[in-house]
């Protein structure tokens, strides 16, 4: 969806977050969890390939795919197969949000470990395309526009304070560095 078309619908990021809550309330747990992961972490469609594994098995495991690793106190996402994995290598994202942890635990309870987390109505694993289609149908039904991961990311970035972003851009130019370097080196000191 083009940014111009997206502006026409004026979907706000907090509306997406509220929709996640609505899906959860309506017991559409899988849909809620998929959209939650997209809004919380801005992942692409590779969440369709997420499997889950207990932390104790993960530690001695040669990991290849994308996993949600679940321990009694710790939970994280370990991704090794995504669009830019050749550049960034395996990434690990801690899950500290208690509600998201609870949603994940509820979702994986009936699933065997090391199996795909997101299944279609036939019990088959979602593909990236299937997941994209599902998210598109959900958002079209709610907002009147089919949103994909890029649209969700655009909505998130549009929700950020423009003055702060412009100050970061200016600072990066003045210092001759990237915004990524500024964030990684200086936000840790705040």
Where in the sequence are the language-model features?
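Secondary-structure boundary elements
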Residues: 25-28, 40-47, 52-61, 110, ...
